[in-house]
Amino acid sequence: NLQVIKSALNNPGIIIVCGSPLSGKTHIIYSLLLEAVNKSKNIMTLESIAKYTLKDVHQCELNENVGFNMDKASRFIEFQSPDIVYLEGIKSKESFDYFANLVFDNKTIIMEFLANNMEDLRYKLSFSDFETLKSLISCMIFIHSQDSIEVFTKETVQKYLA
């Protein structure tokens, strides 16, 4: 499983980390980011609040109250030219399309996806708006509980979410 994750970090695609609220998604993601920093990757995060300060990572905090939302923050990606982008979540179709296009520009995207269980995930991803997302997932990490984490390869994700 670790090799699947490391391979996904080194190749363009979307790494999606799923789980229920407070399941440890952010902890797993920050671990992935630290692994990538150690490989000298240029990393940028777009998140509501930076939970930890990560050395050598461009961390960008969103603030809807002053109009600094995901759409505006995404413009900074072009200036930073990161290899890996972590985003906490996507709230608009336009943002999603933008981040999907980053994969075609050889970027790795790490994103959180809230799902209480596998059935919930399948239901949420069953809508046609997610077809492109599903095709770009290179690795999926699903946190069932603190003691149960499942890692899916691109092929397994495609079969499971079809």
Task: Describe the predicted segments one by one.
Residues 1-162:
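Short, flexible helix-loop junctions that flank or precede catalytic/ligand sites
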